[in-house]
Amino acid sequence: MISSRYSLPVIFLLILALLPTIIHSYLGSEYDDGRSVQTIPTTLAGFSSEPYLRHKDQWVKSLYGSEDWIERIYKNDNGEKIRLFAARSYDYKKLYHHPELGLSHGSNLKEEGIVMLPGDPEIPVFVLRSSSGSGIDAYVLLHEGKFIKDPVSHQIKDAFTQLFQTRKAMTLFYVSDTTAPIADNFKKTSSASILTTAIQSFNANETTGVEN
């Protein structure tokens, strides 16, 4: 039998242990903030687009845990073609853990590092270059209105908070240009322009959150 002097601390610890279950089972485990990548315009930075039909809903859901996604080829009058993929998921690791392995399979990409694009705040972009001599891929991660520079560290720091709050979607913005010269400064590429304007248009959406 528990001594009366320990009863209150024990009750407190039991309530604390049950809180995550209560939150996720009864109040909903996911928070829909009302945003969608579907609102990203089909024309960006002077490029018009058409759907990229290679990847299907089930493939994207399986690989990236997303049911809200787009994939388009943006073209301009000079013949440039930029592929944009954007997706939202509550499974953060599926988005941040080498997204290029699925989206640019077989391209033999090497990580170049993080490039900061101008903005308020600046946008950290993970840049990858093809070892073939041409081709640039790049992606940005966004969570709760903040850009993620170190996704692993971010998830570790966020792990405790997630026990007591409903999960909020992370957004991946991914661009690929298979013909960009290897020596191009990423900041001056069309890929950077497409990426920046896609993010700006997404962030401009008003939100009305709902717990699921």
What positions do the PLM features span?
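Hydrophobic/aromatic-rich, well-ordered segments within soluble, folded domains that form packed cores
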Residues: 41, 48-50, 175
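Alpha-helical transmembrane signal-anchor/signal-peptide segments
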Residues: 26-46
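Short, solvent-exposed recognition patches
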Residues: 48-161
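Membrane-embedded transmembrane-helix bundle of lipid-linked glycan/lipid transferases
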Residues: 1-3
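A short, solvent-exposed beta-edge/loop patch
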Residues: 5-26, 114-212
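Generic detector of ordered secondary-structure context
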Residues: 39-40, 66, 165
